[in-house]
Amino acid sequence: MNDVKYDVNDMPKPGLLVGLSFQHLFAMFGATVLVPILVGIDPAIALFSSGLGTLAHLTVTKYKIPAYMGSSFAYIAAMQTLMKTDGIAAVAQGAMAGGLVYLLVALIVKYAGKDWIDKVLPPIVVGPIIMVIGLNLAANAVNDATTLNKSYSIYALLISMVTLFAVILFNMYGKKIVGVVPILLGLIVGYTFSAVLGLLTGHSFINFSEVAAAHWIQVPNFDIPFVDYSFKLYPSAILTMAPIAFVTMTEHFGHVMVLNSLTERDYFKDPGLDHTLTG
């Protein structure tokens, strides 16, 4: 166990706060950016929406739940299909339909209570659903960890394994601040190993040319209704994505259960499941 622990509302020292912030950024970055890349949407839009969504969730839940709102893997297949057939307008409409389902269930919970949810979705049901969502993307993780320039590379696998084991070792045996930021330290080890391996083999594993060429500040490529496209109702998008909201809702219940265990609180009661769903 780590010697350094902070409660939900505790404020770490400035140095540790910066380290934890960067670790959280890198931890969420991969998943949040991967979904729009797989779907064909500008990742900057996902990051911007994710930030607004997190702030909205924190506000609605009265800053009591330490949660981040990122991209959902459950919608990938549906969004990919809609992007090919009807475009971004249909995807946006389907996402809004999913949000309305959340609000509807939140209203039901507010006035009817949550006991019915406990009966329909006990932990033994919620757990496997979360596992399936994660394992369904295992192929993407393996592919990213073993390919370089879209082809298999033993060097990519080696770098991935070094990074993975570094994170595991820091997490299991790190003391104090080292054990608190294992992901950040694992990334540093991975980048350092990549640079050294590149020098030894003559291969270039690190390329910052696109970063150097990118603008420091740039507005995401938003697609605005009535400006970039004409409004049209997409029943197929609504019927496709609205039901998936119940899948991600189950995932949400699991996340809250885990947070309850980690923080030794009951967020189903305070601020309440209706608030977490609305957020």
Per-region residue spans from a language model:
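N-terminal signal-anchor module of multipass membrane proteins
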Residues: 1-69, 73-87
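Flexible hinge motifs at transmembrane-helix junctions and intramembrane kinks/re-entrant loops
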Residues: 38-43, 152-155, 165-224, 231-254
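Alpha-helical transmembrane segments of integral membrane proteins
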Residues: 15, 19, 23, 45, ...
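Intrinsically disordered, low-complexity non-transmembrane regions of multi-pass membrane transporters
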Residues: 1-19, 203-226, 261-269, 275-276
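Membrane-embedded alpha-helical modules
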Residues: 85-201
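Hydrophobic alpha-helical segments embedded in the membrane of multi-pass proteins
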Residues: 29-30, 45-55, 71-76, 100, ...
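Buried hydrophobic positions in well-ordered alpha/beta secondary-structure cores of metabolic enzymes
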Residues: 39-42, 70, 122, 181, ...
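Membrane-embedded helical hairpins/re-entrant loop segments and their flanking transmembrane helices
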Residues: 5-15, 37-58, 240-279
